[in-house]
Each structure stands twice: as structure tokens, then as C-alpha cells.
């Protein structure tokens, strides 16, 4: 697009990337087994497999204690670095993004409309239930746009929100859209996955 620069493109950290970020610090968790169980319940096993690791092997390191878990997380970190571009994109991921004039806010899964943007913390990844509560302009943004919804219900547009989740990765479609600064959809594609 005319006038675009590379910095205009922002990659958002999704729930899986947030779980991976926390997995790399598992040795610091007070109850690493409980934390890892939660991560497994939230599908981190696919990421482990992608880097040549397994749930069973990870559990063995956790059982061996903090030092063994630290060695394992360092090994996983090194495996990520060995894959060209993987570490670079993980470093570049942003919690949220907004247009220069503050018209549009882009998030992974949700927000808590009762909190300012700087206090959202985990709501960006786990705030699905609050997203549907947005029935007025949030913090001056014309639209809040998210790309993940637990039910993968497709494209949903309300006066103040947009959801783009056709279930990509779950047998559905990959949804993408281009918005003007008023939050109106000017182009949209849907690709079977």
C-alpha cells in the first residue's frame, strides 16, 4: 500500500504465544506441575511437539526439580532460536495494537471493558467473556477488533466490536479484513483451512 512502512505491520501475541512465553519460565513457578497441567489443558502440547519435545519428557524434568527444569527451558529456548525467524517474531509480538489516531484497537481474544488498556494484563488472551459486554465506545476507540473467539463463530460485527474467527486450525476458515479508520470493513477474505 502506498505510504506503508514495515513498522505499520504488527503481530499480536495470542494465547499460545503467551503460554509459550510462560513455559520458558516454568522453573520460576511455585507449583510448576500445576502450571504445566493448565498449559497442557490449553493445547501447549502441539507447540512442544513442533520443537521436538513431549509432554512426558517435560514432566520428567519438572519432577526432577528446579535445576532440571531450568536446563530443559534453556534447551527449548535454544531450539526456538535454531529455527530461522522464530525467536525474532516471538520478540516482536505485541500485547495489543491500535491505529495512530486511536480509532481502532486490535486484540487477540478480548478485553475487560471495566479496565483501561494498560491494566488489561491477561484479559487480552483470556477476556473472551467480557468482550460481548462492550456496548459503548471503549476508551475512545471506535472499534475493538479481535481475532479469536472460543466458539469460533465466524465474523461478528457490532457497533463497537468486530470478531474475526472462522475456526482456522480447528477445521474452519481463516478470516481477514481491512478496516478504515471509522471501523468499517472495506475488504474481507475467508480462506478454508
Walk through the language-model features, giving the residues of each.
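Feature recognizes metal-dependent phosphohydrolase scaffolds
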Residues: 1-193
